[in-house]
Amino acid sequence: TLGAEQKQWLLDGLYDSRSTWRLIGNPYNANPLKIEDLDTPELRAMNPNLRHNEGIYVSNEGWDDYQVERKEILDFLVEHDIRNVVFSSGHTHVFFASELQPDFDDPASPVAAFDFVTGSLTADPPAEDIAPLEVLRIAQQLLLAQNAPYLKDVNLIDQGYALLDCTPEETIVTFRVIDTFDIDAQPRTYAQFRVARDSRHIERMV
């Protein structure tokens, strides 16, 4: 949670920075994780008093618990045309790649920033001890479907880490996975993304 003083410090830093890339280290995912969208034109026609962005969200201590503050930050970035903002997030123990919009239910809402969330290396048991792999694969597809088009990738199964490489012209994020229960296992790249300087979109490279 950001208090008023902390939030203003963050906004001032983003506004005053002359760096090409503005990186925000973040303990939890900034992207929404909606299980069911309840703010649809059909539902709103039946209930005009429906709250904006109404839905059932995954409760994981992420920014979905602080939607007003998230929107304020993203609106600020759009209002002042502050680009090249990348949230680098962890602690969720899964991989996500997302484009962040002030209003995720409005297709015309501009992309204000990007969120890349890394999996964990040592914090979790084998995925199949949590749920059958087929169930996890279905969950991945459901999350992608419910959070399209801004959620670009989700991996609930593999353990691993992320590499973030910034140059003056682009940021490359590489998701690496490894079987941490196999002593002979080697890491492999399962996904790689590019954000070009001043771009509003993520490009998938792998």
What residue spans do the PLM features occupy?
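Long, structured stretches of catalytic cores involved in phosphate-ester chemistry, encompassing
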Residues: 1-206
